[in-house]
């Protein structure tokens, strides 16, 4: 078992590479794939999440496309729960419902299978990064529209300057963030 102490969190944070001017000039991109390449950091991340969320009565873990799958699916497996993917339109084969959300320039849409969540489900949402909160806001709306209860969301990285934390807290979500980075 590994605890969420400062040394462990430092290992995780230091494994995340910062790529300047990607995908456009002026952006400091936080590359979670470098964490995945580091067995020690990836395992520490998963161990912390398992320890935090075990025995809390969750019935499903929902992960958002695509990097949320990299943390959500193994977490669900370790917790003995089902994993539900939330995806871009046209990627899920069964009947879906969709939720539109605003981006900095334009909008996007997410979908979930209509039979993946029901009123008996207590759901944990996970994604790699919390920025503006739009993706998770749409994901939570999808889950709640299907009758699921969702009050917890976990992120490996948070960019608090972009306002996502406040946006999601206004939806009555308890947030866990393993690393914070300043800026965009």
From Swiss-Prot:
Task: Say which species the protein is native to.
Answer: Shewanella sediminis (strain HAW-EB3)
Q: Which reaction does it catalyse?
A: AMP + diphosphate = 5-phospho-alpha-D-ribose 1-diphosphate + adenine
Q: Where in the cell is it found?
A: Cytoplasm
Q: What NCBIfam families does the record tag this protein with? A: apt (TIGR01090), PRK02304.1-1 (NF002632), PRK02304.1-3 (NF002634), PRK02304.1-5 (NF002636)
Extract one GO cellular component term from the record: cytosol
Say if the entry is tagged with keyword Ligase: no
Q: Which GO terms describe its molecular function?
A: adenine phosphoribosyltransferase activity
Its EC number(s): 2.4.2.7
In terms of InterPro entries, this protein maps to:
Ade_phspho_trans (IPR005764), Adenine_PRTase (IPR050120), PRibTrfase_dom (IPR000836), PRTase-like (IPR029057)
Family, as annotated: Belongs to the purine/pyrimidine phosphoribosyltransferase family.
Entry's PROSITE patterns?
A: PUR_PYR_PR_TRANSFER
> Which keywords annotate this record?
Cytoplasm, Glycosyltransferase, Purine salvage, Transferase
Query: Pathway listed for it?
Result: Purine metabolism; AMP biosynthesis via salvage pathway; AMP from adenine: step 1/1
Protein name in UniProt: Adenine phosphoribosyltransferase
On assembly, the entry states: Homodimer.
Q: Name one GO biological process term.
A: AMP salvage
Disulfide bond sites = none
Its top-level enzyme class, in one word, is transferase
Q: What does this protein do?
A: Catalyzes a salvage reaction resulting in the formation of AMP, that is energically less costly than de novo synthesis.
């Amino acid at each position: 078992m590994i605890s969420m102490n400062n040394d462990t969190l430092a290992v995780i944070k230091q494994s995340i590479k910062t790529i300047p001017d990607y995908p456009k000039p002026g952006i400091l991109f936080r590359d979670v794939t470098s964490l995945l390449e580091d067995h020690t950091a990836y395992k520490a991340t998963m161990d912390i999440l398992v320890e935090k969320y075990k025995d809390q009565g969750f019935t499903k873990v929902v992960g958002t496309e695509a990097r949320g799958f990299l943390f959500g699916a193994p977490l669900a497996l370790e917790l003995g729960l089902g994993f539900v993917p939330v995806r871009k339109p046209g990627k899920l084969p069964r009947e879906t419902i969709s939720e539109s959300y605003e981006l900095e320039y334009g909008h996007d849409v997410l979908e979930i299978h209509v039979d993946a969540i029901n009123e008996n489900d207590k759901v944990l949402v996970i994604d790699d990064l919390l920025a503006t909160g739009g993706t998770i806001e749409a994901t939570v709306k999808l889950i709640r529209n299907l009758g699921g209860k969702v009050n917890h969301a976990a992120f490996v990285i948070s960019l608090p300057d972009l306002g996502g934390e406040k946006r999601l807290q206004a939806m009555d979500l308890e947030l866990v963030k393993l690393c914070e980075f300043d800026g965009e």
